Amino acid sequence: GGIKIHHLDASSPEAASLIGMRRPDVVFHLAAFPRRAASIQDHGASFTRSLAVIEAARHHGVGRVVVALPATSLYGHPAANSLPVKESDPVPRGVRGVVARAVLDVLSEYREAEGLEFAALSLASVYGPRQAPAGGVVAAFNDALVSGEQPELHGDGRQTRDFVYVDDVVDALVRAADRSSGLLINIGTGQQTAVRDLWKQMSGGVLNDPTELPARRNELQRFAVSSVRARIHLGWSSWTDLADGLARVRSAG
């Protein structure tokens, strides 16, 4: 059979009713944290959505919830000698990070008090073909290359990120459906890539550098996550190197 898609607010009674009707073994909650939250209210909605999904899963006897959390917000500003950052070092950055940590705490409480198992996957910078331009710097750069427009970059481009390909992330999510229990698990490559080097790879080094804009307040300067726990508990590690992943993004247009 085919896949039926329901367009619902994850915090709505209709979404809870759908969980009750389908009675799944596992609920994947990937809608908690939109790429860009414009206000404190948006962050509050992230928590409300997550709590609603967790409670609906408990109420309808779901065995496990797999939740995606934003790694760059969860671990604050790690020192260079602490990279790639481990799961034992969460120091939330900004309201988004505080909310992500709160969701993790709620999951732990539901597991202890209600027996609802969970896996919380802390995702690095996920990218892939046909990603919306607002979805991340890879998508924004690709959109600029396709449209012929000059991309914009906040800061000097020396800031680093851990870019992990979407297919690899999907594999980790599927593995988390029946492995591990009550754990926060990083999903990333463990490798840092400077944003300006990313542009050089994508543009072939023959186009002008992006237009430099003022750095964002509280900008994260360097980041990568350790995937040791993922290898141990999920049997997972990233297999798509950045060059191959970017080639797939570019070929998809």
Where are each of the predicted segments found?
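Active-site Tyr-X1-5-Lys
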Residues: P78-A79, R93-S122, L145-S147
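C-terminal substrate-binding subdomain of Rossmann-fold SDR/epimerase-dehydratase oxidoreductases
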Residues: L145-G253
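Flexible, glycine-rich beta-alpha linker
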Residues: L74-Y75, G94-V95, A119-G136
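NAD(P)H-binding glycine-rich loop region in Rossmannoid oxidoreductase-like domains
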Residues: L8-S46
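Conserved Rossmann-fold NAD(P)-dependent oxidoreductase catalytic core, especially the SDR/UDP-sugar
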Residues: H29, L51-V95
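Short-chain dehydrogenase/reductase
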Residues: H43-G44, P92-L104, Q131, G135-A139, ...
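Conserved active-site helix of classical SDR/Rossmann-fold NAD(P)-dependent CH-OH oxidoreductases
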Residues: S50-L51, A100-S108, A139-N142, D171
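A conserved pocket-lining segment of Rossmann-fold NAD(P)-dependent short-chain dehydrogenase/reductase
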Residues: S39, E87-R93, F118-V126, F141-V164, ...
